[in-house]
Amino acid sequence: MINSVIFDLDGTLLNSLDDLADSTNYTLRTAGYPERTRDEVRRFVGNGIYKLIERAVPTGTDKAEIDKCFDIFCRNYKKNMANKTKPYPGITDMLKTLYENGFKLAIVTNKADFAAQELCGEMFGDYVKTVVGSV
């Protein structure tokens, strides 16, 4: 009998694209690079925030500069990750129903662990007890 459910986070439970795009563009502006559209950022997500930044900066940017941009992004995103991020419609009710029916719920994501822990605690803390993000 199935008694546990494991979910992904971004694009599955949470719509986080706007905050990711805002922090990406803050980073690019700060570093003197052109900003990206929301659709471009959407195409860049999916393999963690380092890869997001690597894809967002201009082609040919060296690793030291990418590392600097990654640090800028992380500092900004820590302060702004929950400005626009919200669960998709019906997600909180679904998690509540599963929890109330005895299911153990977990989230495993390639989102940075600091962000996954904070967002899940704030938005799903009553129902999801295990959250694993990337280091």
Feature locations, PLM:
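Short, structured helix-loop boundary elements
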Residues: L17, R38, R42, Y50, ...
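A metal-dependent, Asp-based hydrolase signature
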Residues: G46-K79, T97
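Substrate-recognition/cap helix-loop segment adjacent to the acidic, metal-dependent catalytic center
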Residues: R29-A31, E35, L52-G60, K84, ...
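Active-site neighborhood of HAD-like aspartate-dependent phosphohydrolases
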Residues: M1-R43, E100
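Charged catalytic carboxylate motif
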Residues: D19, S23, G90, A115
